[in-house]
């Protein structure tokens, strides 16, 4: 049993202007409105219930509806709204998951860069240490060569001058 009413029909029942009702209908969620065969906007039963709550008036008196049916329909509306909220939050969570994945990837890249820099620094330190050892060895060889030259010179002069 599908109850739908046009804006004009609702305005007539409530005794309000069509424009006032049209403005209210535009504020309703999409699921509370539809288009009929002629392309005219109609308000569904759930939308009519919401309008009844807004205006505190009964819109469709000719069809008696039990309190159980009203309660069930109200519950369906609430469940639909909660489901929409759950979907919105789920989409938000998916977006956060994507952001976290991107951050994780950025962290992995940074970790690789840090490891590479550590390796380069270690290599540089090893090269510096080797260069210092080579320099020390060359200095020792130079000092040794100087001593040999000095001893050779002394030996030559000592022999020359009878020493």
Swiss-Prot record:
Required for cell division and chromosome segregation. Binds to DNA and is involved in segregating the origin of replication (oriC) region to new daughter cells. One of its GO terms (cellular component) is cytoplasm. The N-terminal DNA-binding helix-turn-helix (HTH) domain and the C-terminal membrane-binding amphipathic helix (AH) are both required for the function in chromosome segregation and for its proper subcellular location. It is found in: Cytoplasm, Nucleoid; Cell membrane. Coiled coil: none annotated. Disruption phenotype: Nucleoid defects. 15.7% of the cells are anucleate. Unaffected localization of the divisome. Chromosome-partitioning defects. Newly replicated chromosomes are not segregated (in 7% of the cells) or partially segregated and eventually truncated by the newly forming septum (in 21.8% of the cells). Segregation defects result in small cells, which constitute the majority of the anucleate cells (86.3%). No defects in chromosome replication. Chromosome-pinching takes place as nucleoid is asymmetrically distributed in elongated and constricting cells. One of its GO terms (biological process) is cell division. InterPro entries: RocS-like_C (IPR007489). It holds the Pfam family HTH_24. The gene is rocS. It is a peripheral membrane protein. The keyword Iron-sulfur does not apply. This is Regulator of chromosome segregation.
